[in-house]
């Protein structure tokens, strides 16, 4: 589960050859495409670590449109519907002992009575149980880069697009082997301190703008190794032709989880492999 926390928050150490300065912002240039930008986000972060300087805002303003990971990310009704099981009870997917541990853990985190927790979450997918842990680590003063970017794009009258559908992102967790997801959840319950430690490492690397360090942390997480193809690499590959199509007609500001950028199978390298020039921008 530590890996899932990392993936959700990455969000998810080498030098790029431009001095000691590191960055999460890059320009993208290629033949027959409009000059565009790539920015690495972390989906939720404490407001004390949040950094959105004027230069970043001005760079967003140079683009014709904002492109996030998920299309229609603001459709809360659709997202909530996709969190529901088609049928059955989520707690039936666990042994009685595991289900009891989940109920005690979740009700304690959320300040609910065990029976109320069980009733409220029985119709939810297992992925929602992961989200409980994520939300527990976030305080009331957390901020979201995606939400802020959408707000600024709206003020600029820039359209907001996505690299993949909401259905495809939810399918990532729907398609994980049940035993893999179960172990992720139970590991988080057994060792909550590990997830907290990983979050601290993740935030430190993000604040340091260390794209390669973030990729390394995520991929080397003990739980994610067997699922890196589904959680990261396949999505990265699928995004490149979509990015190309967008850039043929519009200058884009692409904003995706920073954990997707680094490494030999990260978005930066895949763009270079596709013939693009990707240049770091200090901000």
What does each of the following model-derived ranges do?
Residues 1-26:
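Bacterial Sec-dependent N-terminal signal peptides
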Residues 23-24, 52-54, 240-241:
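A generic local structural motif
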Residues 226-283:
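A cross-kingdom marker for long, charged
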């Amino acid at each position: 589960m530590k890996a899932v926390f990392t993936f959700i928050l990455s969000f998810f150490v080498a030098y790029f050859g431009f001095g000691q300065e590191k960055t999460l912002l890059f320009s993208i240039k290629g033949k027959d495409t409009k000059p565009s930008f790539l920015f690495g986000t972390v989906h939720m972060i404490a407001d004390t670590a949040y950094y959105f300087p004027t230069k970043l805002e001005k760079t967003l303003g140079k683009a014709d449109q904002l492109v996030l990971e998920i299309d229609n990310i603001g459709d809360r009704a659709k997202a909530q519907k996709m969190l529901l099981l088609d049928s059955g009870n989520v707690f039936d997917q666990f042994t009685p002992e595991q289900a009891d541990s989940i109920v005690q853990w979740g009700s304690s985190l959320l300040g609910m009575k065990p029976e109320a927790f069980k009733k409220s979450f029985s119709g939810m997918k297992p992925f929602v149980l992961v989200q409980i842990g994520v939300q527990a680590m976030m305080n009331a003063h957390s901020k979201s880069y995606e939400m802020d970017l959408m707000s600024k794009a709206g003020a600029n009258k820039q359209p907001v697009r996505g690299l993949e559908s909401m259905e495809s992102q939810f399918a990532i967790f729907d398609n994980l082997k049940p035993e893999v997801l179960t172990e992720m959840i139970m590991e988080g319950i057994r060792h909550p301190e590990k997830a907290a430690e990983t979050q601290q490492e993740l935030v430190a690397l993000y604040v340091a703008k260390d794209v390669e360090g973030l990729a390394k942390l995520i991929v080397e997480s003990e739980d994610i190794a067997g699922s890196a193809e589904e959680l990261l690499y396949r999505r990265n590959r699928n995004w490149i032709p979509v990015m190309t199509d967008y850039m043929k007609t519009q200058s884009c500001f692409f904003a995706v989880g920073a954990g997707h950028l680094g490494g030999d199978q990260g978005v930066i390298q895949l763009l270079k492999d596709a013939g693009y020039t990707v240049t770091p921008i200090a901000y």
